[in-house]
């Protein structure tokens, strides 16, 4: 894990990168934290152990891989899905894949503890992925 806090103040951002998380597909940190609020970069359905492996077939398998990759980042932060306050889902084939993505996504959260969410149809994602999800989490006080 790499943690960089340039200023050392609580309000200064802390940039988190984890060797256990998937390889970056662009120049970003896995998560950035300030005052207990954590922005978690959108994860792709890549294999964290083999970035060169082909992406899983279908939106259900890709959604599972994305959620599992997000859990890796959360665990690196010492957090879990119960600390997630909101998510944004980006999906390339909205009409075709929304229902299957949604059914897979909701299986990760208890019905009475689902984060706020926005779902956005996009024209493309890195590596021709079908889905990408980012999160906002908060450390307990």
Question: PLM ranges: what are they?
Answer:
Residues 1-68, 72-85, 91-141:
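N-terminal presequence-like segments and the immediate start of the first folded domain
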